């Protein structure tokens, strides 16, 4: 019996390579011991042509995220995984599974594409306080009919370049020039410069900059969400990968038990023929064989399903044939420190950070709503230079700057809201929402601490379960070896040996299950803490 080594100790028989032809694809159960080295290249998974295709798509995505207007003339065209090229089974390590998911998982690709739109939302918010340009133009033809006199046709053309800008204090500056050109080539442009400044309602950076600050917070949170989204997918890949290992071990365990049950049945048949056992002495064993056959069938179906789930989670072709290791490595069993984990979660947990950002946005909305209750007092000034019509023949641009035709005006506008329920409603809603989100933030903080506490308690319990499972395997192995010696001495039956061997197989299956449960709980904790990418030494290619 080939034994698998981990931490210098024999743990369980290595699972032989199992190949199953699945309706929608093919996979192989756990093979030899040990995991594929994480440094193994992905070249055997990705052809040179596919590598080139990936590189070009990555470059397009990078350009689109850095400059979203790249999408006006181009497509990103992220590639999906190619069809399986290898008919032979390929060994897949956990690190390889994660790296392939980073390239082909559709949820990760969608999150990367979302960054294009998200970056442009920030650009839109910044554009509010940038210089705005526009060019307007119009042409008109008027025809008049005068009874007894005749007809008259007049044509007019107007081209108006416009520039305006809004500052963070609420000041609005505008500049436009009306260019009038008629049929007599009488060009007489008019330049208008205007300025408006609210003094109460709409005044101040806190009011006018609120949307921009919200957009900046949203952009920062979008980066965090991208990391969290990738972390969630990686955790799913890890879970699916370990589930396949567990289902493969379960299948192999059920097959071994069925094999041993058939051996016992054959031995009993010989004893019945020799008169050493009653003719009905094999009925119970026949029932055991049928029960185990059913369990093997169920285990085979679970294994096939787990294989397809892993391929789908990674984003690979369903017809890909792969094998995974028969065991997982735990290394040193550790329980994370509770206080350190809570501190890290409060700094990096995406949902909690999103709630804090929402609270900040509510505070800004409350400030804006309070400002909206004030009187609307606006001062403005306007300077017009030039002439609409030319009366002395000195037309052209000189009419703008010669100082002869300047009109200056100033104004103040006051609007006093009286029983304006809409404005009052805005303030009421803002205060209620702010109060609710304050309570929600406190509740979410407590819920996060509770979740971290429960998770670490589970990790501690699973660590003890794993250590107990190791001892159980050791004792079951000793019991099995003892029964073998008894059988050789003639004081133990084959049935006794089979029973102790089944106990050993069950203990080994329990050990694998305990290890995977412990590791999965650690992976889930890393996901909640926001440290999954750091743990796997992954740096996002785009969007940060």
Enumerate the language-model features and the residues they cover.
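Regulatory alphaC helix of protein kinase catalytic domains
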Residues: 74-100
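Amphipathic alpha-helical coiled-coil scaffold segments and their short linker/junction regions
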Residues: 101-102, 164, 277, 281-282, ...
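Periplasmic alpha-helical coiled-coil/stalk elements that build and connect Gram-negative outer-membrane
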Residues: 223-344, 458, 462-465, 503-505, ...
């Amino acid at each position: 019996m080939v034994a698998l080594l981990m931490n210098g100790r024999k743990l369980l028989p290595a699972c032989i390579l199992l190949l199953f032809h699945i309706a929608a694809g093919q996979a192989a159960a756990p093979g030899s011991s040990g995991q594929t080295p994480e440094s193994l290249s992905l070249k055997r998974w990705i052809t040179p042509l596919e590598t080139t295709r990936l590189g070009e798509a990555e470059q397009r995505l990078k350009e689109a995220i850095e400059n979203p207007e790249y999408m006006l003339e181009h497509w990103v065209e992220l590639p999906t995984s190619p069809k399986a090229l290898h008919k032979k089974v390929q060994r897949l390590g956990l690190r390889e599974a994660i790296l392939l998911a980073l390239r082909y998982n559709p949820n990760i690709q969608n999150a990367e594409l979302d960054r294009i739109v998200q970056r442009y939302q920030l650009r839109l918010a910044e554009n509010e306080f940038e210089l705005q340009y526009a060019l307007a133009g119009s042409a008109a033809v008027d025809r008049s009919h005068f009874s007894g006199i005749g007809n008259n046709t007049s044509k007019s053309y107007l081209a108006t370049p416009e520039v305006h800008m809004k500052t963070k204090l609420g000041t609005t500056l505008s500049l436009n020039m009306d260019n009038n050109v008629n049929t007599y080539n009488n060009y007489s442009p008019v330049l208008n410069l205007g300025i408006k400044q609210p003094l109460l309602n709409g005044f101040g950076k806190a009011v006018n900059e609120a949307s921009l600050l919200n957009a900046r917070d949203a952009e920062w949170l979008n980066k965090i969400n991208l990391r969290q989204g990738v972390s969630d997918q990686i955790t799913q890949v890890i879970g699916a990968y370990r589930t396949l290992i567990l289902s493969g071990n379960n299948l192999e365990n059920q097959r071994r038990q069925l094999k041993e049950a058939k051996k016992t049945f054959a031995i009993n048949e010989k004893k019945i023929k020799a008169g050493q056992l009653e003719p009905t002495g094999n009925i119970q064993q026949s029932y055991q064989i049928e029960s185990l056959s059913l369990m093997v069938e169920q285990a085979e179906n679970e294994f096939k399903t787990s294989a397809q789930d892993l391929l789908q989670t990674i984003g690979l072709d369903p017809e890909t044939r792969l094998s995974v290791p028969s065991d997982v490595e735990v290394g040193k069993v550790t329980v994370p420190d509770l206080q350190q984990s809570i501190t890290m979660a409060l700094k990096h947990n995406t949902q909690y950070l999103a709630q804090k950002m929402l609270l900040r946005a509510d505070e800004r909305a409350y400030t804006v709503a309070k400002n909206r209750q004030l009187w609307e007092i606006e001062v403005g000034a306007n300077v017009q230079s030039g002439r609409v019509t030319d009366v002395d023949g000195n037309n052209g641009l000189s009419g703008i700057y010669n100082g002869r035709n300047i009109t200056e005006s100033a104004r103040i506008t006051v609007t006093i809201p009286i029983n304006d329920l809409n404005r009052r409603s805005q303030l009421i809603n803002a205060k209620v929402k702010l109060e609710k989100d304050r309570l929600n933030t406190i509740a979410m903080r407590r819920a996060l601490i509770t979740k971290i506490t429960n998770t670490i308690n589970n990790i501690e319990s699973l660590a003890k379960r794993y250590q107990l499972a190791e001892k159980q395997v050791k004792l079951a192995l000793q019991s099995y070896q003892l029964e073998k010696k008894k059988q050789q001495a003639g004081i133990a039956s084959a049935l006794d040996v089979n029973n102790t061997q089944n106990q050993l197989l069950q203990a080994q299956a329990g050990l694998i299950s305990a290890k995977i449960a412990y590791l999965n709980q650690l992976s889930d904790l890393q996901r909640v803490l926001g440290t999954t990418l750091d743990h796997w030494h992954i740096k996002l290619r785009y969007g940060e």
